[in-house]
């Protein structure tokens, strides 16, 4: 049997801060476990790609994490990833049908915008939630 959906859906996130330690760099994203629950819920691993290619690789392990102060707000760890800077964008791949359907307003975080790209047409399916819509 095959998949009806396949590898679809990408969560775009911005690097808001990089916290350096001896062997690791914690890449803090603006996306969090409430946006993509699969890694926190059952250890799913999603491919992460930089949106702009620079070529220079980091010598440290990058730990991709969200801004929520929870030990499970972690996406993945990657060695030899391209060097990143604050305000860079990354793509978390293959979030598919479970990305938005498992998302929540945990920690009063609004759900992300949903955009459909069909060929050269780009359409907003659902606008980003506003804080007043949550409360």
Model regions: which residues?
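Charged (often Lys/Glu-rich) extended helix/loop segments that serve as interaction or gating elements
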Residues: 1-135
């Amino acid at each position: 049997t095959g998949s009806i959906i396949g590898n679809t859906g990408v969560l775009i996130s911005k690097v808001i801060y990089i916290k350096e330690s001896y062997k690791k760099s914690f890449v803090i994203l603006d996306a969090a476990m409430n946006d993509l629950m699969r890694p926190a819920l059952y250890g799913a691993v999603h491919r992460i790609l930089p949106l702009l290619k620079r070529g220079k690789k980091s010598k440290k392990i990058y730990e991709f994490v969200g801004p929520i102060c929870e030990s499970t707000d972690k996406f993945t760890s990657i060695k030899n990833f391209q060097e990143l800077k604050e305000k860079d964008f990354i793509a978390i791949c293959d979030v598919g049908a479970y990305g938005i359907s498992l998302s929540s307003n945990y920690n009063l975080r609004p759900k992300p915008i949903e955009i459909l790209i069909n060929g050269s047409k780009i359409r907003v399916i659902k606008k980003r939630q506003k804080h007043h819509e949550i409360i």
